């Protein structure tokens, strides 16, 4: 198959053109056809008539294909292959080892559909911060009480500053089998 194309490099005004000649052999186009024919994520079940030794060889050949994601061999001579591969090429390779190879089932694996309307959780109606806040301590009143003594009135005022508390080391006694009850400071 010959394809001739003319293409101008420098635009329509220039007379320099180049001719590209593509020669595509039938063999390479055949392989290209099968490469493009590869199905995505297929599940193929082969029926094989083999003994244990040839079953291991068949598994080795199938594992050698690129795109095979899983392989399952059953006792009845069924071989289940999952992945992205060419069914025709795999059958051709298996026929070199086994006497009889047949494709029982070939189906594409469908990905689970995502839910178009995802479930959203409803958030409870929240009240404004002012209503939610709880008073945890009693606020001292600013108005002086007439029935209290003047010292009691002074104590009811809120403190503006406080002294930091200094932790004091407590003496501890060590008691044990070999100790005589000494005090450590």
UniProtKB/Swiss-Prot annotation:
A lipid is attached at residue 182 (S-farnesyl cysteine). Residues 109-158 have a biased composition (Basic and acidic residues). Residues 39-106 form the HMA domain. PANTHER family: COPPER TRANSPORT PROTEIN FAMILY-RELATED. One of its GO terms (molecular function) is metal ion binding. This is Heavy metal-associated isoprenylated plant protein 11. Residues 183-185 form a propeptide. The modification Cysteine methyl ester is found at residue 182. InterPro entries: HIPP, HMA_dom. Transmembrane segments: none annotated. Belongs to the HIPP family.
């Amino acid at each position: 198959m010959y394809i001739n194309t003319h293409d101008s490099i420098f635009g329509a005004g220039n007379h320099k053109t180049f001719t590209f000649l593509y020669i595509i052999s039938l063999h390479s186009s055949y392989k290209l056809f099968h490469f493009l024919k590869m199905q995505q994520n297929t599940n193929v079940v082969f029926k094989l008539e083999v003994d244990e030794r040839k079953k291991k060889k068949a598994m080795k050949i199938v594992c050698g294909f690129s795109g095979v994601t899983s392989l399952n061999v059953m006792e009845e001579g069924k071989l289940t292959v999952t992945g992205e591969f060419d069914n025709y090429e795999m059958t051709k390779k298996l026929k070199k080892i086994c006497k009889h190879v047949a494709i029982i089932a070939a189906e594409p694996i469908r990905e689970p559909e995502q839910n178009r309307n995802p479930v959203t959780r409803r958030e409870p109606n929240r009240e404004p911060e002012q209503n939610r806040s709880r008073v945890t301590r009693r606020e001292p009143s600013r108005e002086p009480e007439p029935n209290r003594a003047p010292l009691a009135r002074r104590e009811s005022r809120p403190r503006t500053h406080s002294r930091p508390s200094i932790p004091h080391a407590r003496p501890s006694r060590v008691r044990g089998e070999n100790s005589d009850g000494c005090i450590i400071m």
